[in-house]
UniProtKB/Swiss-Prot annotation:
Matching NCBIfam families: PRK10742.1 (NF008012)
EC number(s) recorded for this UniProt protein: 2.1.1.242
Protein name (database record): Ribosomal RNA small subunit methyltransferase J
GO molecular function terms listed in the Swiss-Prot or TrEMBL record: rRNA (guanine-N2-)-methyltransferase activity
Native source organism of the sequence: Salmonella arizonae (strain ATCC BAA-731 / CDC346-86 / RSK2980)
Subcellular location: Cytoplasm
PANTHER family, per database record: RIBOSOMAL RNA SMALL SUBUNIT METHYLTRANSFERASE J (PTHR36112:SF1)
Enzyme class: transferase
Length: 249
């Protein structure tokens, strides 16, 4: 995949070349999207809109840390949707990992989560965030046990993941209407990089075959059900809907 690769660390240790080789990235000086190695982290920038800033995965600070410390935990909609109850903490495959936010919430309350991400740039961002999280004295011990990244296309990986998870979680890219600054910023950068998930409808059936208990699909409240298959079971929040489908025992 072609993208502008920039090293701002000043280390001169060839880390960017190693990164490019690992994720199959090719430097393109004229690409509007840039993957930038900074002294703190790896980040994605839209070069023609510098005011948007960089997008990176951060399990340690910012919104993620606040959500872990002060969020609803088991009371969060995503936790309810996957079926967390009492001692039951399902094994989850998050087949559309993105920046890993929902996967991290599930891991923080005790679920084991395998994240699938097919885009190599997004996978590199996730991997960088995980590496920093794993190294942290506070969250590292449990994060290493519960949150894992698999760089693969969900359309193929969903047919051969072992062991089978109890829950498959899907949050396909869908054009957002919200005007919040964060959503606008991230969606604009992400849409520029990966575009909408045009093949997302094809994920529902293999997800239902893989999950032993249920499939959870997160949708904006105005979006039609995935693959136009309606379900009476849903958890509705302000702005979103978690559609719940039966898996295959």
């Amino acid at each position: 995949m072609k993208i502008c690769l920039l090293d701002e660390t000043g280390a001169g240790d060839g880390a960017l070349s190693v990164l490019a080789a690992r994720w199959g990235l090719e430097h393109d000086e004229n690409n509007l999207m840039a993957l930038v190695l900074t002294p703190q982290h790896l980040e994605l920038r839209k070069r023609d809109e510098p005011k948007l800033g960089g997008i990176f995965v951060d399990f340690l600070g910012g919104a993620m840390a606040h959500r872990r410390k002060f969020g609803g935990g088991r009371g969060e909609a995503v936790a309810k949707a996957v079926g967390i109850k009492g001692d039951y903490l399902p094994d989850v495959v998050d087949a559309t990992a993105g920046l890993g936010r929902d996967a991290f919430v599930l891991a923080s309350v005790g679920c084991r989560v395998r994240m699938l991400e097919r885009n190599p740039v997004v996978a590199a961002l996730l991997d960088d965030g995980l590496a920093r999280g794993y190294a942290d004295a506070d969250i590292g011990p449990w994060l290493r046990q519960r949150l894992q990244l698999i760089h693969a296309s969900s359309l193929t990986a969903l047919t051969d993941i072992t062991p089978r998870p109890q829950v498959v979680y899907l949050d396909p890219m869908f054009p957002h209407r919200q005007k919040s600054a964060l959503v606008k910023k991230e969606m604009r950068v992400f849409q520029s990089l990966v575009g909408p998930d045009l093949d997302a409808d094809g994920l529902l059936e293999p997800a239902r075959q893989l999950a032993t208990k249920r499939v959870v699909v997160k949708r904006p409240d105005y979006a039609p059900p995935l693959a136009d298959i309606a379900t009476p079971n849903a958890i509705v929040t302000k702005g979103h809907r978690f559609d719940i489908y039966a898996g295959t025992a």
